[in-house]
Amino acid sequence: MKNTFRFGCFLLTAMMSANLLSAQTGSINIVSTAVPFLRISPDARAGGMGDMSIATTPDANAAFWNLAKLPFAEKRTAVAVNYTPWLKDLGLSDVYLASLAAYHKVNDESALSTSLRFFSLGNIQLTDFSGNILNNIRPSEFSIDLGYSRIISDKISLGVALRYINSRLVIGDVGTGVVYRAGTSVAGDVSMFYNGRDESGAGLTWGITLANLGAKIGYTNDARNKDFIPANLGLGVAYTTVMDGNNRLMFGMDINKMLVPSLPAATGVFSTDSANLANYRSTGVVSSWFKSFSDGTNQLSAFQVSVGAEYAYNEQFFVRAGYFYEDKSRGNRQYASVGAGFSMDAFQVNLSYLVPSGSGITRNPLSNTIRVGLLFNISGQK
């Protein structure tokens, strides 16, 4: 991709700074944060089930969704690699999300895990307002984390993770008089998992996750000009039924809520809007988590819902389907997805496809998104 942006417009879109974004108007209450790539579904298995994965059966990708699942994993050590071309339906060819996750069970009750996400925004050519070329940049973002999870009772486990986040969008002075730098943050995850499956694998599972609880990100030395990261509360439930020795069906639901308050409503009065925005930006991180439940907007519209199912034959062939729903006032992402998987010995491949929807200006820009994932079980049964 070689997109040309006027520099001012690039800052408006790429920097993800709340003070540069439009405040909510009318019934539109989209929450803006830095590093939104942290909320992109990274793996193909979850992608085939409408981005549902908080309470599904554990594999290496659990490090992205709910690492508390990992002590209940059947394999002692596993690694997952995933690749997602992003916004292909818009003609972009070099924007992608790549991810890696791995875990190792220290014993039958605890596990160590790690995950890495790398998001490339492609090649972007910057120009000034006169059309003069400034330079070419390749913005990128990544996160890396380490986690520990442990079974605390026969059916319940807890997990914690520490994450480093780096967002390198613009570096140095590119003709505006402002010196930009990479934005960094440190965040944590806390999660719980209930495993009610019996020896055959049938039963109820559910989980709770608190993800990306961490410091704001800034792209300049101005301490007042920092943005929230996408803190999130997730609840998930799934049920697995084993029809016979060869056939298994799992279905479930995830509900997610961003722990970031909406921008203050625009009044049209510059002094008032400036004061409201300054007050919003001065909100502390911990305070913002609680304020997200009382920011003056319709809280029912703030919940994102994923429903999905997975059919497995002989734990070798997998078929998946799901649906993701987000209210129109919060971004209007609504799509169906399908997926498939094949497993042989220590190797598994997963694919997912986001079904096209809408047409013209209403066409979903995520249409035709394909995710590819590989899973390697390095050591045997737990």
What residues fall within each predicted segment?
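Bacterial Sec-dependent N-terminal signal peptides
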Residues: 1-27, 237, 309
